[in-house]
């Protein structure tokens, strides 16, 4: 395969149009490194990390296979970088959903929980990497080594904002959400043991139903009544969690 011109935006896969790339960002022709990440996002979401073939991504883009090593060191490095991008987008999508919800404490919390379900569903096979790290130890080790600080920051910010949502439901108010967590906020929220317990319960509950919905639980996936009522069951579960606060 000959060397590509730097201004060559064509690819052997004709489906990789400007419109395709706009699914991922506002750039209709992102840099090649980002294109590799975006195709990896799709491939792992669809087939899971074990069946991911980085050579297929390169072939779709019309680049040589060693380009993965050039940008990411190796296949696992590519998966680690992409896993962080997926996690970052997942967390931010939760709060985009809250921002779009009506200014009502219950509706904002429900928006967060529903987005947890929806985003985890879109995440697909990435759930195995992010929720069950032992299934991809090398990938998660690289991810932790490269992005541990950023992951911790996102995790703490997500829980801090969720604590505010939960507290708002109990008080019947709507509070502004911080753009980032600082030591003062961390200390303030950490001192409210009752809220911390409720936040943990809400977060675990939302993740549980999200993983169940995405994973197509082997036993219940074959029960027609469960399939037909899936959305209603999730809605009832979310209502129950919120009503118990």
What do the PLM-derived regions correspond to, one by one?
Residues 1-31:
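N-terminal intrinsically disordered/low-complexity leader segments
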Residues 20-25, 82-111:
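Amphipathic alpha-helical linker/stalk segments
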Residues 32, 75, 82, 86, ...:
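Hydrophobic/aromatic residues within well-ordered alpha-helical segments
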Residues 32-35, 39, 43-77, 81:
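Helix-turn-helix
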Residues 33-34, 54, 76, 106, ...:
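Short, structured helix-loop boundary elements
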Residues 35, 39-47, 89, 93-100, ...:
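Solvent-exposed, amphipathic alpha-helical segments
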Residues 91-96, 107, 128-132, 137-200, ...:
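Amphipathic alpha-helical packing segments from all-alpha helical-bundle domains
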């Amino acid at each position: 395969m000959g060397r590509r011109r730097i201004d060559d935006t064509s690819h052997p896969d004709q489906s990789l149009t400007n419109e395709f790339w706009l699914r991922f960002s506002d750039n209709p022709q992102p840099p090649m490194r980002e294109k590799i990440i975006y195709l990896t996002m799709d491939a792992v979401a669809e087939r899971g990390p074990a069946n991911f073939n980085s050579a297929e991504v390169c072939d779709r883009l019309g680049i040589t296979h060693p380009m993965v090593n050039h940008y990411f060191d190796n296949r696992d490095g590519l998966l680690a970088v992409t896993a962080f991008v997926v996690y970052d987008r997942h967390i931010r999508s939760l709060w985009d959903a809250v921002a779009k919800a009506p200014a009502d404490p219950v509706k904002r919390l429900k928006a967060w929980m529903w987005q947890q379900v929806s985003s985890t569903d879109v995440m697909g096979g990435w759930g195995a990497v992010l929720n069950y790290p032992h299934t991809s130890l090398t990938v998660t080790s690289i991810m932790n080594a490269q992005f541990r600080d950023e992951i911790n920051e996102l995790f703490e910010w997500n829980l801090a904002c969720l604590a505010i949502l939960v507290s708002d439901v109990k008080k019947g108010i709507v509070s502004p959400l911080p753009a980032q967590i600082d030591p003062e906020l961390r200390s303030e929220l950490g001192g409210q043991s009752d809220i911390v317990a409720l936040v943990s319960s809400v977060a675990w509950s939302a993740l549980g139903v999200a993983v169940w919905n995405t994973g197509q639980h082997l036993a219940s996936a074959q029960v027609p009544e469960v399939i037909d009522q899936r959305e209603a069951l999730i809605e009832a579960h979310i209502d129950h969690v919120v009503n118990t606060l």
